[in-house]
Amino acid sequence: MRRSILVLVTLAFLASVFAMPQFSAAPNGIGEVANTPGCFCHGLTPSDDTKVTVSGLPEQFNASETYSFTVTIQNDVMALDGDGVVTDGSRTVPYGGFRIFVASGGATISGVDATLVQELEGGLSHTVDGNKFRSWDFEFTAPADDTKTVELVVYGNAVNGNSGAGGGTSGDYWNKVEISIPGINAGSTGPSASALVIFITAVGLAVGLIFVGILWVFYRRSPETFTMAKFWSFLKPWLTTTDHKEVGVMYFLFGFFFFLVGGLLALLFRVQLALPENDFLTYDEYNSFFTLHGTTMIFLGAMPMIAGFMNYVLPLQIGAKDLAFPRINAMGLWLLVFSAPLIFSGIWSGQGADITWVMYPPYSSLSEANLGESLSGYGANLGTISFISGMAMLGASSTLSGVNFITTVFTMRAPGVSWMRMPLFTWSVFISVFMLYMSLPALVIGVFFLLFDHTLGTHFFVAGGDPLLFQHLFWFFGHPEVYVVIVPAFGIVSEVLATSARRSIFGYKSMVFAMAGIGVVGFIVWGHHMLTSGMDPFWRAAFMITTMLVAIPTGAKIFNWLATLWGGSLVMKTHTLWSLGFLVTFTLGGISGMFFPVAGLDIHFHDSYFVVAHFHYVFIGGTVFALFSGLYYWYPKVTGRKLNETLGLWHFLIGFSAYNAAFWPMHALGIMGMPRRTHTYTIESGFAEYNMAVSIFAFIFGLSQLLLVWNIIYSGKRGEPIGKDPWGGWSLEWSTTSPPPTPSFHDIPTQEDMNALYGHHSEAPTLKEKLWKGEPKEATS
C-alpha cells in the first residue's frame, strides 16, 4: 500500500513538472525577448559602411553643465526593404539602433524622448519604438569635477527592415565611435600606468618580499657562515623534491598566495561598485579584474589548496610511503606554477584577458586571425591568447594529478584499509579526482578549439561554427568542477566533526554512497546553466529534475553530520568552529541554489546577483571554510606545532560574521534586478546602499585573513609543540610523528578497527536513546 502511494506521488510530481508553464525556446534566446525585432540580430564584426555621427557635444565641458547632442546612423550602401521608403519615424519595422554608455569620467546621459530610449546595463539603448529611427536626441550632464576627462562609447547599427516572425533581419550592420571630452581644467597629464599594471607590479613585489623573507630567515640561522651557495643548497631540495609532503606544502602555499591575490582583485572591483556611477576602474579594467578574480580563486586558489591537502594527507591516511608516481606529481605542480604567469601576462600589454572565467564565445574567439587587421580591435583583449594557453596548461596539470591519486588509492592501501574502512577524506579525494579526470577532456577540447579560433582563424565557435557548443563543453566540465572542489571539503568536515565529537562518523556507508551519488548525478545536470540559451522543453525538464536530485545525497550528508554531533561529546576548537560554520553557510547556499532548476524562475535570476550570492555561499562558505578547518586541524601534523587558538577564534568570529554580512545582501540585489558582471549602476536603480554594505564587509572579511597569515607565520616558530595525535584522531596519519619522516612510513602499518579494539564510546548514549528516552542507558553491574 505504501509503495503504491509512493509511486502515485512520484508520478503526480513528474506530471506537474512537465505541465509547469515554460518559456518557449527560440534558436537565439528566450522567446519574447529574443523576438523583439532588431535587438539580437547584430553581426559579429563592425561594418565600415555604417557611419555613426555624434553632434552637439562640447570640445571641453564645464562642471555640472548639461549639453544636448544627437546620434545619427547612416548607411548609404544598404538597400531598404518593406516600408523602408516611408518617412523616418512612421515606419513599422526596424530601421536602426544604438547602445551608448560612459566608459569613465562620471558623466550621465539621458534620452530626450523616453518612448525611444531605455536604460540597459549601465548605459542607454533604444526601445522597440526607438528601433524605427536612425537619429536620437540625448542630454549629457557633465560631472562636478571639471579636471576629469569623460570617455563616451557609442554603438550604432543600421537595419534594412526585413525582420520576420523569428526576429532579426538579413541586413544589419554596425559600427562604433569613442569620444573623449576633457573638462575645462583637465589640462595635460603625465604618463601613468593602468590599474592592471599597478596591480601585477604589486603582486610581483609581494613575491619578491616573500623571497627576501625566506633569505632572511636562512641568514639568521648562522650569519657568520652564510653564503648564497649554502642558501641555494637549502632551496634546491624544495624545488626538485618529489616527496608528497613537500609537494603538498608547496601546492597549499601556492594556492593560499593566489587566494589572497584573487581576494585583492575582488576588493578592487568592490571599490568600483561601492558607489553608483563610479569610475574608479574603466570598463576594460573592470572586465579584466573580474575575469582574473574568478579564474584565480577557482583554478589558482581553491584547487591548489585542495591539492595540497590531497598530496600531504591521503598517502598518510592509507598507509602509503608516497604517491604512485612521485615525479609525475612534481611535474603537475610545476605545470600549475608556470600556468599562472601565462594567465596574468596579458596585463603587461595593458590588456588583461576580459573573457570571464567561463570564456564564452563568440567574443572570446574573435581576434585578428578571423577579423582581419583592420577590425582586430573589436575582438577580445590581447591578453586572451596567453590566458587561454594558461588554461590549457592547467588542464594538463590536473590530468596528471587525477591519474596519480586514482592509481595510489587502487594499489597502495595498507593492510586493513579496505574500501569500506578508508577515511572519508580519502574517499572524497578518490571521488573528486575521478570526476575531474572524466570531465577534463571536454574542457581541454573546448579550450584548444578556442585557441585555434583565436590564433589560426578556425571557425569552431565564430560565424560558421556554434558558440553554444562551447557552453556545453565548458559546463560538462564546469558543474562537476564545482563538486571537484566541494567533495574534498565534505571529506575534511567529516574528519573534523567526527574527531571533535569524539565518536566515529554517523552513517559511514551512507556518507560514502552519498558522495558517490553526487559524483554520478553531477555529470547530468550541466544543462541548468543553459536554461536561458534555448533548449528543447523535454531536456529543460530533464535537467530540472536531475538538478533537484542532487539535494538528496547532499541532504543525507547534512543530517549525518548533525547526527554525529548529537551522538558525540563535542570539543570546541578552531577547526570545529570552521566546520560548524561550513554546515550553516553551505546549507544556506544549497537552499538558494534550488531556485535555479525551476526554469520559470531562472529566467529572472539568471545572470543576476542572486547567482553571485549562491555561488559564493557554496564556494567560500563551503570549500574555503572547510579548507580553513582542515588547515587548523592538520597544521600540527605538518609542523609539529599548533596554530594559536586565540588568533584562530578571532579569525573565525570576524571572518564568519563579515562573510555573511557581505554576501547575504547580494540575494536582495539579485531579486531587485542588479545584473552580475556590471561595471556600474545608476543612483535611481536603488542598488547603492546594499552595494556599499557589501563592499565594507568584504573589506573586513579580506582583512580578517591577515590574522590567519600571521597565525601561520607566528605558530610555525612559537606555536605549542605537540606529539603524534593532539586531537584524538583515529586514522593512520596520526600514528606517525609530527612532522612525518621521509618516507612517511618506514614499515607499512596495519589499520585496526578502533571500535573493536578499545570499545570506542561503547557507553555513550545512542541517537535513539537521546531522541526518545532522554536518559543514557543504565550501566550494567
Where are the language model's segments positioned?
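Hydrophobic alpha-helical membrane-insertion segments, chiefly the h-region
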Residues: A15-A19, I210-L215
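Core hydrophobic alpha-helical transmembrane segments of single-pass membrane proteins
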Residues: A202-V212
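Sequence context surrounding c-type heme c attachment/ligation sites in exported
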Residues: R2-L6, L14-E139, K148-G204
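Membrane-embedded and interfacial regions of multi-pass energy-transducing membrane proteins
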Residues: S188-G204, V217-S781
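Ser/Thr/Pro-rich, low-complexity mucin-like regions
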Residues: R134, E139-S170, S398-A414, W710-I722
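Short, solvent-exposed linear motifs at loop/edge-of-secondary-structure regions
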Residues: E65, E139-D146, A556, N560, ...
